[in-house]
């Protein structure tokens, strides 16, 4: 191992691995004419695949908005309208870009690297190159926070939840979707426990909970929690 690699932080190593996956695995699928995730057409009611790369990217983004609502058991398609919505760790999937919010924000520590790689869509969304544990936004100013398949990627999951609660207005909604009981990896270093995550929500009201039989990653399984701020 080269000397400089030995002294690099775990966060830097994790970031390199994240970027490599998006560039070497995810983006080639889209450029080859596919979708990743592969259920985009079902979520878009059978809409035929777009002819262009950018068109497919926007289809992925719009499907991601529908996916979040469906998984959270939110039937109102206008749920995000006129709200301030924050997505924690969106990557380049495009949820912040397609979300029909009054203000749509992606908190993504790799935002600049995604932009440099031309993986971010051109939209009105704001991407903050910030950690989930220290978001540069004022307390009690956000209506909805989404963290889909990102809680086990952050540096400190409990601190990320505390930060989300700081940001939410009274009555605000936190939508979590995360793997539990999985083997830690360089990009997903935390083996989360559903009961422990619930304990971090403390005074919040659980509005919806779902336990999947499959994971986002390689093993374990996913849990969906939708919680309301008091």
What are these model-predicted stretches?
Residues 175-202:
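Conserved class I S-adenosyl-L-methionine
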Residues 210-230:
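Core SAM-dependent methyltransferase catalytic element
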Residues 158-173:
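A short glycine-rich, Lys/Arg-flanked "PGG" loop and its adjoining helix->strand segment in the class I
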Residues 130-145:
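A short acidic, Gly/Pro-enriched loop at the edge of an enzyme's catalytic core
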Residues 2-79:
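Class I SAM-dependent methyltransferase Rossmann-like catalytic core
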Residues 86-134:
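Class I SAM-dependent methyltransferase SAM/SAH-binding core
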Residues 82:
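Phosphate-coordination loops involved in phosphoryl transfer and adenosine-cofactor binding
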Residues 144-155:
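A short SAM/SAH-binding and catalytic strip from SAM-dependent methyltransferases
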């Amino acid at each position: 191992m080269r000397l400089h690699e030995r002294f690099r932080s775990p966060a830097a190593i994790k970031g390199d691995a994240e970027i490599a996956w998006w560039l070497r695995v995810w983006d080639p699928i889209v450029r080859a004419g596919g979708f990743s995730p592969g259920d985009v057409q079902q979520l878009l009611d059978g809409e035929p695949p777009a002819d262009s790369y950018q068109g497919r990217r926007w289809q992925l983004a719009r499907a991601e908005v529908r996916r979040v609502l469906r998984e959270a058991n939110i039937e109102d398609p206008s749920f995000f309208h006129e709200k301030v919505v924050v997505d924690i760790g969106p990557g380049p999937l495009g949820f912040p870009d397609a979300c029909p919010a009054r203000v749509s924000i992606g908190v993504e520590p790799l935002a600049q690297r995604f932009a440099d790689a031309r993986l971010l869509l051109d939209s009105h969304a704001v991407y903050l190159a910030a950690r989930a544990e220290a978001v540069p936004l004022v307390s009690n100013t956000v209506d909805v926070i989404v963290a889909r398949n990102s809680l086990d990627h952050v540096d400190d999951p409990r601190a990320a939840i505390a930060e989300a609660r700081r940001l939410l207005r009274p009555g605000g909604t936190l939508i979590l979707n995360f793997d539990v009981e999985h083997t830690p990896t360089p990009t997903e270093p935390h083996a989360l426990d559903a009961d422990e995550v619930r304990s971090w929500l403390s005074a919040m009201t659980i509005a919806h909970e779902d336990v999947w039989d499959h994971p986002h990653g390689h093993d374990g399984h996913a849990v969906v929690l939708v919680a309301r701020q008091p």
